[in-house]
Amino acid sequence: MRTHYCGELRAEQVGTSVTLYGWVDRRRDHGGVIFVDLRDRTGTVQIVSDPERTPESYHQAEGLRNEYVVKITGRVSGRPAESLNPKLPTGEVEIYADRIEILNAVRRQLPFQVSSADEETVREDLRLRYRYLDLRRDRMNRNLQLRHQVVKAIRRFLEDEEQFIEIETPVLTKSTPEGARDYLVPSRVNPGEWFALPQSPQLFKQLLMVSGFDRYYQIARCFRDEDLRADRQPEFTQLDMEMSFLSQEEIIDLNERLIAHIFKTVKGIELPRPFPRLTYAEAMDRYGSDRPDTRFGLKLVDVSDVVADMGFKVFSGAVKSGGKVKILPIPDGNDRISNVRIKPGGDIFKEATEAGAAGLAYIRVRENGEIDTIGAIKDNLSDEQKAEILRRTQAQPGTLLLFGAGSTDIVNKSLDRVRQFLGKELGLIDPEALNLLWVVDFPMVEWNADEKRYEALHHPFTAPNPQDLEDLTTARAQAYDIVLNGLEIGGGSLRIYQRDIQERVFETIGLSHEEAQAKFGFLLEAFDFGTPPHGGIAYGLDRLVMLLTGEESIRDAIAFPKTQQARCLLTEAPADVSDRQLKELYVASTWQPPIKERD
């Protein structure tokens, strides 16, 4: 029976007889004495096999190879002074092996090195194909251990300090798509009908508030059939919370204390509170994004009114058509950014155009403080306009001013993308910084020009600001998102709890009475039975862990993730199923493989 984990052993255990289980991380033969680094999920410890002390264990050690699974019994000994390893938590001790038992061998060539001593850069597709080996490596082991610590800290805070209870909600539920597509599951028992996998437990947690469970939480599995990015997965985990009888300020305060508890427990970091706040309008105006990265400056400056009447039609035309002209000032940009990079073919130009912009105009502030302009801007920018631009941007000599002009949406998206690109490229971001902030006062709805209707900016169960009830198309939502280093890690709101307001919101977003009843009739009915005021929030657990571990991809915060093509390279899911299975479900596939053209 195991007595200790490998990473637990310290000088206090010297003289103790121990039994360890683990994998051979590395084997070294030094002049007749064999050293083995034995690894389990807690760390590694050095095993010594000396032929003069235990010939039998030495013979067994000779047959060991990397990643063999072994059981080792021996005695803890202090290392000689010259062999101490301060980089290793177990570096003061070693185990003299009395007996080594091989439990399983490696019978195929390893696709990559697992050993922490020889950790190499491995292609991600290979890591995902052999994920069980990748998870043995230090990096992924640390990530999953930290993920566990985060969940443990969440449970301890919510249950022990705030009287929340954990309740599971259904995974097979009704399809009520809003935004992303649902994953659908055919019902064999009810032919022709379908379940959906939940995009969130939103409706059920609101029903739990109706039921009187006034403080609910769940570590919930959620599913969205959407195009994937580096920080998204088709199935993901979220911390889901809902509370009755709390104001928005009380919910924000509770969540700040929760986040501070997680960071203190997991990373030993004291977060200053309260967290900064921006309104949605402020965030979009200054950063072009509702999830701004505030670890660096480079704030946008709106000069639409300054250039509205100038002869340069790109600027004046954008303003006349209801758009914006904004400037992204780059201090010391004259020395660091060449014209070539801003013009067609340049990397900065590419960032802007990939976000929808036609291009970027620019001017430079020379060392004498004068604006140096080129082309059409030079011919149409008056001295008064130049002076006002300098005043608003507070541009110092050497500053590069990048202009975005067009629809408000494209200007914000393109300058936000350029800002993020330059923040990294110019080394303006402190990689150790952790900048948290709340974004509040979101619009209730936004106009979808393609579908010619309003859509809920968050979801249609978000409560409008009581001051804005007269016109829901211009109303502010009682919503709040929490942002960490430019990524939204959580979003929530106070909820609608009165049937008449909920029906008005459905009508505003184009749901007929019949559609609303068919999709959400059960919720509307519940509102007739004494629903308390309530609100909540949901955190993307995978994304939070990604940020806490310093990883670039959410896949490195998940044990068995999918690729950006929504595939599992380990199990080869999704995969074909038999005609018999489809027949049992009364389902037929209409998909046809594309016809290859002949040469």
UniProtKB/Swiss-Prot annotation:
GO cellular component, one term: cytoplasm
Annotated keywords: Aminoacyl-tRNA synthetase, ATP-binding, Cytoplasm, Ligase, Nucleotide-binding, Protein biosynthesis
Subcellular location as annotated: Cytoplasm
Gene3D superfamilies in alphabetical order: Bira Bifunctional Protein, Domain 2, GAD-like domain, Nucleic acid-binding proteins
GO MF annotation, one: nucleic acid binding
Tagged with keyword Electron transport: no
Record has Aminoacyl-tRNA synthetase as a keyword: yes
Pfam families: GAD, tRNA-synt_2, tRNA_anti-codon
Residues holding ATP: R224, D225, E226, Q233, E488, G540, L541, D542, R543
Residues holding L-aspartate: E178, R224, H458, R495
Recorded catalytic activity of this chain's protein: tRNA(Asx) + L-aspartate + ATP = L-aspartyl-tRNA(Asx) + AMP + diphosphate
Region (Aspartate): 202-205
Stated role: Aspartyl-tRNA synthetase with relaxed tRNA specificity since it is able to aspartylate not only its cognate tRNA(Asp) but also tRNA(Asn). Reaction proceeds in two steps: L-aspartate is first activated by ATP to form Asp-AMP and then transferred to the acceptor end of tRNA(Asp/Asn).
Family in the record: Belongs to the class-II aminoacyl-tRNA synthetase family. Type 1 subfamily.
HAMAP family named among the record's database cross-references: Asp_tRNA_synth_type1
Assembly and binders: Homodimer.
Protein name, as recorded: Aspartate--tRNA(Asp/Asn) ligase
Organism: Synechococcus sp. (strain ATCC 27144 / PCC 6301 / SAUG 1402/1) (Anacystis nidulans)
